[in-house]
Amino acid sequence: MRHLLRTFCVVVLAVLLAPAAFPAERAFPFGQELLLDAQPMRPGKRMPILTIELNGDAKIDLWCRTVPARVELSESAIRIEPGPLPQELPEMQSAGQCTPERIYADEQMLAALAGVTSWRWEDSAVLLFGPTNMTFRAATN
């Protein structure tokens, strides 16, 4: 009887402690603005932001331009199909903000996002993995 009680207590304790030992995977932060963890590119203040909705629709705010995208996402896999970069620059940007360097960075970032294949949480950051790895954090404003 004592052995049975001890075994029962061990099983109950293991069940209670298992979630702490193996925390549940965090879900992807759908609907949140995810800000690229990078140094600002002067002269503008705009930073790339990725927003993915639960239905797979996405908006990618790049250094200068914004493009729509479709995203397929699973536990750890992700595939981003960005729309084409618009030729025209945004009207709402200040003069000189979209420098040739920023326009080139738009093209590079869009290509990097199209190449990601997996994602995961690390602390408070969402990491995207592909030929170019990227770190995004939830926007706090």
Regions found by a protein language model. Give the residues of each.
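Lipid interaction determinants
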Residues: 2-6, 10, 15-141
